[in-house]
From Swiss-Prot:
CDD domains: Maf. This is Nucleoside triphosphate pyrophosphatase. The keyword Cytoplasm applies. GO terms for molecular function: nucleoside triphosphate diphosphatase activity. It comes from Prochlorococcus marinus subsp. pastoris (strain CCMP1986 / NIES-2087 / MED4). GO terms for biological process: nucleotide metabolic process. It is found in: Cytoplasm. It holds the Pfam family Maf. Belongs to the Maf family. The active site is at residue 78. Nucleoside triphosphate pyrophosphatase. May have a dual role in cell division arrest and in preventing the incorporation of modified nucleotides into cellular nucleic acids. Its EC number is 3.6.1.9.
């Protein structure tokens, strides 16, 4: 059984649409605890910490009543948008979102998503979980933005969508129409590389 160690609705929808069986549990990990300047390495470490937190605290988590699986896979993810070498997380307010979009208009950046997959054995009666293997990788996608009119930027920022997304845009939402093209994994831009997940599971004999 796959556990998605994230509260992200985008990642949840990706797994649901792919008909991959899973349960979603937020790790509630404090991202400020990780100090790493390299953006790619930062996303990878954050994904690992999120997955590890679920593994370490599994006995305290209120699991579904019929969670009687002998093997459990825990998936942690974290996404950060890189623009001109700088990390763009979620904008703190509308003013910051407007400034960022004014810079990104007609330009490109990179969406990095760190992935960690912990494979483990699980005793449902004692709720003892033992991690047997981990796979980690950062997947990066190049995102090209359309040249926007100032009014378009204002309207998008006023929708408030940018305030809830890494980089200040949502490919699957209103922001999708402002993205010219993507080089690399499409689903990665939404927070989870489905091809990477599929290949990682299949390597361990799990066919999602």
């Amino acid at each position: 059984m796959l556990i998605l160690a994230s509260a992200s609705q985008s990642r949840k929808k990706l797994l649901e649409n792919s008909q991959i069986e899973f349960i979603q549990i937020s790790s509630n990990f404090d991202e400020a605890l990780v100090k790493e300047k390299d953006i790619s390495n930062l996303t990878l470490e954050l994904s690992f910490q999120k997955a590890s937190r679920i593994a370490l605290n599994i006995q305290e988590i209120d699991l579904p009543e019929k969670f009687n699986y002998s093997s459990v896979e825990i998936l942690g993810c974290d996404s950060i948008f890189e623009f001109n070498g700088r990390p763009f997380g979620k904008p703190s307010d509308k003013d910051e979102a407007y400034r960022r979009w004014s810079q990104m208009s007609g330009e490109f950046g990179f969406l990095h998503t760190g992935h960690t997959l912990l494979f483990s054995t699980f005793d449902s009666s004692s709720k003892i979980l033992k991690v047997t293997k981990k796979i980690k990788k950062t997947v990066s996608s190049k995102v090209y933005f359309s040249k926007l009119q100032d009014e378009e930027i204002k309207n998008y920022v006023d929708s408030l969508e940018p305030l809830y997304c890494a980089g200040g845009f949502a490919l699957e939402g209103k922001g999708g129409k402002y993205i010219e093209r993507i080089d690399g994994c499409f689903s990665n831009v939404m927070g989870l590389s489905l091809p990477w997940l599929r290949k990682s599971l299949i390597k361990e004999g799990i066919f999602p």
